[in-house]
Amino acid sequence: MLNLPVPEAEYINEVLKPSETQQEMVSSFADRAERVRNGNVDPRTDNMLKITNDGRKLALDQRLINDLLPDEPESKVNLCVENAYQVWEESTPDKSTQLIFCDLSTPKADGTFNVYDDVREKLVAKGIPREEIAFIHEANTETKKAELFAKVRSGQVRILLGSTPKLGAGTNIRATCCRTNSNVG
């Protein structure tokens, strides 16, 4: 085992109130669970695993349940965007990088709503150059990963989004990392 120095972490737990839509949906999850427990629904149609998965999606962003629902200003995603933008501004002199972990709603090429694209578009709208925001999923070969990590270490990429399996292990960028946002999902 390597005895590398580990920086001391500051953990911040953000507590958000659910939107009215989220409260209604949680109530509907309880109704669904009751029907499942009572055997009133075919397990292929609905089951506790589906209900739990829908709950995880709802906790992240209600648009993951139905992309026609409104973008709630007080959502986890919007709080992450605000925090990421603030840290980006503060760390600009050092060109430090932030990691944003999101295990649900990874990037899709089919145009459906996903958190990764939503975060990137909102950060770009706030003024962060698009080329400073990357997804680990775009580096789908070892060569592309090495190129991406080099851009991170040089300060060309300042915000890197990824899932825990893809970004959590084997990522050698700690020399420039200033913040990790893992509360997104």
How would you describe each model-predicted region?
Residues 55, 146, 159-185:
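SF2 helicase motor core recognition
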Residues 12, 96-100, 157-162:
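Generic beta-sheet signal
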